[in-house]
């Protein structure tokens, strides 16, 4: 015990703590110097010297370093968060979407992820928790720095700030797009936090800002015909693992045999985050006009105005986001996980029972939106053991050495989705109605696919595997016979480049014959007027960026070419 106290006293020596605190705060800046290779060398050097010198100066503003480090606690949190993200994604700073994900990701998903990020979590605990504890001890003991030490260190810090300021001037002079709030950590993280707070406020005010909006929608199809249209939004499904897209494994044996299924080969998502991609799929918003989301209602309201009975069923938990708001515009809506026992693993097949009930209700005009859980990590929990076709699939830790197990489990989720969609189509066929189904996914997924060893999605810089998503349209025999022009347009457009988020709204309205001034047939793949447009991705600051401006690497571009996708 005596030796332990002596060790703590030695560690709490003010000058040692002064140096320790600067070092632990500087770790992310040093790490970013090596990870952000897209930045110029001057910018990366500046990103170390200026912020670290500012930390250095702040540490000289008080005599008690233990107190100062606790005052700087937000930056300690940012540092820990930043290092975990670097471990997960390999590059980039804490994005706006990452802050928003903290409020929209349910606890179950978070625990699944954290359980598989133990090395990173343990690492930041080992570095930052002891620093804070030692700071607390030092503060409680009243340990103070000598004035002579503070004065000398302040001179060094000011010299570093001057050097950093000069480097910043050089960056502004030599780089047209350079901005401190974008390029320099932690200034950029603070800026992103402010943006996240602003967006959260705007989202919370959606009911008010969209209150008086109307699509002025009407129905063009025969009012005496029974019509059923279904929009299925998948989760984390990537096109390259679907047998329908030429995957080496037979992951879609049922859809392969389904009559009336058309596969679109070149469809990209405009966001790799659920909380942005799904609202675009449920509305007229797109990367090019994302802000209309705050003013307009969604596709469900357009169908309601046209006389359809509308339903929204989700196998995900509500989280006070746009997904909830747009879904709750329906006549009937339900989040099936909400009332389930805590920890219950609800399969997507539960959605089919709700669909069957709606179909039996006999609505003349029916629009159904399903939000599935699809292929969301942890993959092994997305399907029953009886659907475990590809084995072994029992190791779930997010490690490169487990790639085979993870890929097997992921492929099993796609095969499960195949069965889910085939069952849904069978239900629609039994109605003998004028019906259609559109299925796509919000985004794809990285599964340690190449030497970058990327995993999951929602990374600040996306990859090919997160962008290329499945996009299927099924038309009933009755629909194909009565609306030959639409069927021919779908076949004509199946190999053209498509922005899934921009197209779904207009395609569904087109399929259902819903007329509104907000419908653009040039964006509908079910229309001969469909036009090929430049490809955009919605970046972290909600700005549309061309594919060649979002940081894709040579490995991604090679996959675009290998899969015959248009780039950029």
Positions of the model-derived regions?
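Membrane-interface soluble catalytic domains
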Residues: 8-20, 64-68, 301, 318, ...
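A long, amphipathic alpha-helix that forms part
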Residues: 55-56, 353-356, 394-437
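Active-site rim elements
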Residues: 42, 179-180, 287-290, 341-342, ...
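Histidine-centered active-site microenvironments of extracellular/periplasmic hydrolases
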Residues: 246-250, 433-434, 440-485
